[in-house]
Regions:
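Conserved Rossmann-fold NAD(P)-dependent oxidoreductase catalytic core, especially the SDR/UDP-sugar
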Residues: 93-134
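N-terminal Rossmann NAD(P)H-binding glycine-rich loop of SDR-like oxidoreductase domains
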Residues: 3-23
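Substrate-positioning beta->alpha
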Residues: 169-174, 188-211, 219-220
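Flexible, glycine-rich beta-alpha linker
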Residues: 117-118, 156-174
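Active-site Tyr-X1-5-Lys
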Residues: 132-156
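NAD(P)H-binding glycine-rich loop region in Rossmannoid oxidoreductase-like domains
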Residues: 49-87, 101, 119-123
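Conserved C-terminal active-site "lid" loop/helix of NAD(P)H-dependent oxidoreductases
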Residues: 199, 236, 258-300
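Mid/C-terminal beta-alpha module of Rossmann-like enzyme folds, strongest
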Residues: 212-273, 302-312, 316-333
Length: 333
């Protein structure tokens, strides 16, 4: 395979690049940020997917047989202006044009998100959307653009759940740092079922989609990640690996009050370990339908314990020296 990865400098992209390199595939990462892993820099081409001419040149020169489209703005901070996520839906349209103009492309994976459906909404079919954030809406538009593109290659849409693992700067900065200092408290012992995914399993699932027979993958939508589980199991495993101790629990109302305080800090630009959004994600079920993914792709290879061990090893192996990518202005031309 000759695999072109958009957004290969990010969290999932860095892990995917490592996997494909180890598998001996020819790989090109097109991203407007440099790779998190300096060792992958030789395979990076600086490129804004909103730049159609540069994108077309990259395709023409590399001649990929397979494309994995990960590039996106993935936060949920913007609540008023959908155009803040223009690189998601419009960027995907431009990527699709580049794919259509490149006859070597045999397969395409387009990345959406579980947030095209709000928590509690179990979609009846692939077009049963219920986004609850502008980010989720931008990904709904991404999915529709893919369906309407009339692609001649095999295409598949993936919807990642909450993904964790090595190279996640969000978990490094928000959860791990607080937990290692002994400042993490979990809100109550109530069972909360969440759809999470170890990044190694997600990369394995992407690889399966690239390799399985085209007729089984074409036009399909798959949630990628692990089967839903009790969030406490994951939190306890991380705590024991990081600190050697079980998690400490405090009443839900205390954490809710801290979250409100965090909201105030956030409005003035000050960091705080918990906000109302984070509180809701820690105390609300969010279950995605993984059965179809497992049936089509098979069970993923890594256990939760293996994933936690790999992530903590990465965290303790110099992750503090990895800088956050610079914020850039999206080109609309």
């Amino acid at each position: 395979m000759r695999v072109l990865v958009t957004g290969g400098s990010g969290f999932i992209g860095t892990n995917l690049m490592e996997h494909l390199i180890d598998a001996g595939e020819e790989v090109l990462n097109v991203d407007w940020n440099p790779p998190l892993d300096p060792g992958q820099r030789v395979l990076w081409r600086e490129l804004d997917i909103m730049d159609e001419e540069a994108l077309a040149r990259a395709f023409a020169e590399f001649r990929p047989t397979h494309v994995v489209h990960l590039a996106a703005r993935t936060d949920t901070e913007e609540q008023h202006d959908l155009n803040a996520y223009v690189q998601n839906h419009e960027g995907t349209r431009r990527l699709l044009n580049a794919v259509k103009a490149c006859p070597s492309v045999e397969r395409l994976i387009v990345t959406s998100t579980q947030f095209v459906c709000e928590a509690g909404h179990q979609p009846k079919d692939d077009l049963d959307f219920k986004p609850f954030t502008l980010y989720g809406e931008s990904k709904r538009l991404t999915e529709m653009a893919t369906r309407e593109a009339r692609l001649s290659c095999t295409w598949t849409i993936i919807r990642p759940t909450t993904i964790w693992g090595p190279w996640s700067l969000r978990y490094r900065d928000v959860m791990f740092k607080v937990m290692r200092k002994g400042l993490y408290f979990h809100p109550s012992r109530r069972k909360v079922i969440r759809s999470y995914g170890y990044v190694g399993n997600v990369v394995w699932q992407i690889d399966r989609i690239l390799r399985l027979p085209a007729e089984r993958m074409n036009g399909r939508v798959f949630y990628v990640g692990d089967p839903p589980f009790d969030l406490r199991i994951w939190v306890e495993a991380v705590s024991k690996a990081l600190t050697g101790r079980p998690v400490r629990y405090i009443p839900t109302w205390v954490v809710r009050a801290l979250a409100v305080t965090g909201d105030v800090f956030r409005t003035v630009g000050l960091p705080f370990p918990i906000t109302s959004g984070r509180f809701r994600s820690m105390t609300s079920d969010y279950i995605t339908p993984m059965d179809r993914t497992i049936e089509a792709l098979g069970p993923a290879p890594f256990t939760l314990e293996q994933g936690v061990k790999a992530m903590v090893t990465w965290y303790d192996g110099g992750s503090e020296h990895i800088a956050h990518p610079a914020r850039k202005v999206v080109g609309h031309g």
